[in-house]
Regions:
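Conserved glycine-rich Rossmann-like NAD(P)H-binding loop of the short-chain dehydrogenase/reductase
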Residues: 25-34
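Short, charged/polar "capping" segments at the starts of alpha-helices
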Residues: 12, 34-39
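Rossmann-fold cofactor-recognition segment
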Residues: 37-51
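SDR active-site strand-loop-helix element
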Residues: 6, 30, 67-68, 107-111
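NAD(P)H-binding glycine-rich loop region in Rossmannoid oxidoreductase-like domains
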Residues: 48-86
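Conserved Rossmann-fold NAD(P)-dependent oxidoreductase catalytic core, especially the SDR/UDP-sugar
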Residues: 92-111
């Protein structure tokens, strides 16, 4: 199985990536920084606040997990624009783009 995780070093993305490592799945990671606590096949640096994600690289994934988020940790003071864009706008935009491209796998979002 080939999975792509959007979000690299958060609690959720790390836990899912470690599971993917255990079961031997091909793992592509997308985020601001390379994953620290898991192995991965490919890392793609993306900043969803700067540019829209090119979804064409996701099309051969059996499963895409959106685990990017903002405003979750009380100790971080993140602006409302960042919180709304990462938790609402970006996942909806990606979902719509995947639909346009006739993506046949599963898209799961926690945003």
């Amino acid at each position: 199985m080939k999975i792509s995780i959007l979000g690299t070093n958060g609690f959720l993305s790390t836990a899912i990536a470690k599971y993917a490592n255990e079961v031997g799945w091909t793992l592509n990671m997308y985020g601001l920084d390379a994953p620290i606590d898991c192995e991965y096949s490919n890392f793609y640096k993306v900043n969803l606040m700067d540019a829209e994600l090119d979804c064409s690289g996701l099309m051969d994934s059996d499963l895409i997990i959106y685990a990017i988020g903002a405003g979750i940790q009380a100790n971080l003071k993140e602006g409302l624009n960042l919180i709304y864009n990462l938790n609402v706008t970006a996942p909806v935009t990606i979902c719509n783009k995947l639909k346009e491209l006739n993506y046949q796998g599963r898209f799961v979002t926690f945003g």
